[in-house]
């Protein structure tokens, strides 16, 4: 087993698979969302998808190193504590883990040269933490798939 999430998730033969699985995870999360706040998230997702086909996959690939960096402290603590399900571990640390992940997207959105993307992100950022928290068990499962 590699020591860090960077080594695990960013390995040249693994990274494309991680991106593909993360895209599938996002699609599954979108399909299961309902309610008022979900409508805004779905609209932002559709805007990004329609504005530039393949943009979501490109952004997953672009954001992956930052996500690995932000999740690394959780991964290290999970391993040190002898945990068996990283998704459960992330869910228990949902507030902090979701904000760590969102710090990566916040920085990327702020640096975007595409105003429509930045505006779409801005409309959903306020409620994003709860959506990220809901996805943490699946995120952890995705990491575990490649870690072991």
Predicted regions mapped to residue ranges:
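Hydrophobic membrane-targeting and insertion signals
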Residues: 1-99, 104, 122, 141-148
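Amphipathic alpha-helical binding modules
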Residues: 100-147
């Amino acid at each position: 087993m590699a020591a860090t999430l960077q080594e695990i998730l960013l390995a040249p033969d693994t990274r494309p698979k991680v991106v593909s699985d993360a895209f599938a995870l996002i699609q599954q999360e979108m399909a299961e969302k309902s309610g008022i706040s979900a409508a805004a998230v779905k609209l932002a997702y559709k805007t990004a998808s329609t504005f530039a086909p393949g943009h979501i996959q490109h952004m997953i690939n672009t954001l992956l190193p930052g996500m690995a960096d932000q999740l690394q402290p959780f991964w290290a603590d999970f391993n040190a504590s002898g945990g068996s399900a990283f998704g459960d571990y992330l869910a228990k640390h949902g507030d902090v883990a979701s904000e760590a992940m969102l710090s990566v997207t916040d920085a990327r959105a702020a640096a975007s040269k595409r105003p429509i993307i930045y505006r779409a992100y801005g409309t959903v950022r306020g409620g994003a933490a709860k959506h990220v928290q809901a996805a943490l068990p699946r995120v952890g499962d995705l990491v575990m798939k490649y870690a072991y």
